[in-house]
Curated annotation (Swiss-Prot):
Protein species of origin: Streptomyces ramocissimus
Subunit structure: Monomer.
UniProt-annotated stretches for the region G2: 60-64
Binding site for GTP: 19-26, 81-85, 136-139
tr-type G domain residues: 10-203
GO CC annotation, single: cytosol
E.C. designation(s): 3.6.5.3
Gene: tuf3
Protein name: Elongation factor Tu-3
Length: 389
């Protein structure tokens, strides 16, 4: 059976749900797909299909980043259901790096929790510029309490530069919408309308040389190695030569798909699978970058502006000094690096500082690129590359 080709009829955006564990992100994602399937513009993806890995189903939490797709009247969305479990926030960093906007899910019953704040901070650091709030479980909450939670959330958004007063806050119930309750089905439609109108079409860097950070690597028996990820910039077609940075090899793209549909050309913003000719499965891994040959040079040393999280934001309680060796999350790569704070020598929690970083291995870098700094399973800093040195 031949597959139906992907036809680009509407602008494409990448959107994600984020928020604290058990506030209902995955249920809400399932509800969105159900409401749209009933409108005829998508396929219903049940809750247990979004939480894909068996270990997650057992624990009831989302670890890997799960993608679903759907369409509203005006747009085509790839929707990322992001992990809410603290150990796995690093996965969120790489997922958030490709988002055009986000739906922050906050339980109307519990209000802001530690991860709610951490996710908002991370979203800001990795360049998510627009957040729409879904106050979930609103069917079960007391209205006055829900009003207070809304004020809290607006304050949190304002604290991180998201203009909390103007951000849409929609009261929803993912569970009731899944059960088909008309009032709460309408709330999901209102949420999607808010996303359609509040999250602008981003500028896509279609004219720049092709670049795709590798998220996952798979093997298709008899056909070869497939890499998946979101195209950061440029375009790619079947037959194009590409370079895999990190693996040190050049190859040709022999197949191109999005959500299981073949496509002629992928462009910035698309979530794609690339079939690569003659590349051994173990030669490529998450964190590598597929790019137009010669368009990027991997480097290991750079200067950066870094914000060191305060203890209140879940960061360190003690200062960072030169010689500190945390993990740097850059695109989909996770690399240890040495920090040099120069004459200042010390960076206290809550401060923004300049530093020189020497990574343990070379990765494609350029000024303006955002990254997160983590140690012991928590985010301790977030920064931007200022120059290659």
């Amino acid at each position: 059976m031949s597959k139906t080709a992907y036809v680009r009829t509407k602008p494409h955006l990448n959107i994600g749900t984020m928020g604290h564990v058990d506030h209902g992100k995955t249920t809400l994602t399932a509800a969105i797909t159900k409401v749209l399937a009933e409108r005829g513009s998508g396929t219903f993806v049940p809750f247990d299909r979004i939480d894909r890995a068996p270990e997650e189903a057992a624990r009831g939490i989302t670890i890997n980043i799960a993608h679903v797709e759907y369409e509203t009247d005006t747009r085509h969305y790839a929707h990322v259901d992001m992990p809410g479990h603290a150990d796995y926030v690093k996965n969120m960093v790489t997922g958030a790096a490709q988002l055009d906007g986000a739906i922050l899910v906050v339980s109307a019953l519990d209000g802001i929790m530690p991860q709610t704040a951490e996710h908002v901070l991370l979203a800001r650091q990795v360049g998510v510029d627009h957040i729409v709030v879904a106050l979930n479980k609103a069917d079960a909450g007391d209205e006055e309490l829900t009003d207070l939670v809304e004020l809290e959330v607006r304050d949190l958004l304002s604290e991180h530069g998201y203009g909390g007063d103007g951000a849409p806050v929609v009261r929803v119930s993912g569970l009731k919408a899944l059960e088909g309750d008309p009032k709460w089905t309408a709330s999901i439609e209102a949420l999607l309308d808010a996303v359609d109108t509040y999250v602008p079409m981003p500028e896509r860097y279609v004219d720049a040389p092709f670049l795709l950070p590798v998220e996952n690597v798979l093997t298709i028996t008899g056909r070869g190695t497939v890499v998946t990820g979101a195209v950061e910039r440029g375009t790619v077609r079947v037959g194009n030569r590409v370079e895999v940075l990190g693996a040190g090899l050049e190859t040709v793209v022999t197949g191109l798909e999005t959500f299981g549909k073949p496509m002629d050309e992928a462009q910035a913003g698309d979530n794609v699978a690339l079939l690569l000719r003659g590349v051994p499965r173990d030669a490529v891994r998450r964190g590598h970058v597929v790019a137009a040959p010669g368009s990027v040079v991997p480097r290991s040393r750079f200067s950066a502006q870094v914000y060191v999280l305060s203890a209140r934001e879940g960061g360190r309680t003690t200062p960072v000094t030169s010689g500190y060796r945390p993990q740097f999350y850059i695109r989909t790569a996770d690399v240890v690096g040495d920090v040099d704070l120069g004459e200042v020598g010390v960076a206290r929690p809550g401060e923004t500082v300049s530093m020189i970083v020497e990574l343990g291995r070379e990765v494609p870098l350029e000024p303006g690129l955002g990254f997160a700094i983590r140690e012991g399973g928590r985010t301790v800093g977030a920064g931007t590359v200022t120059a290659l040195v």
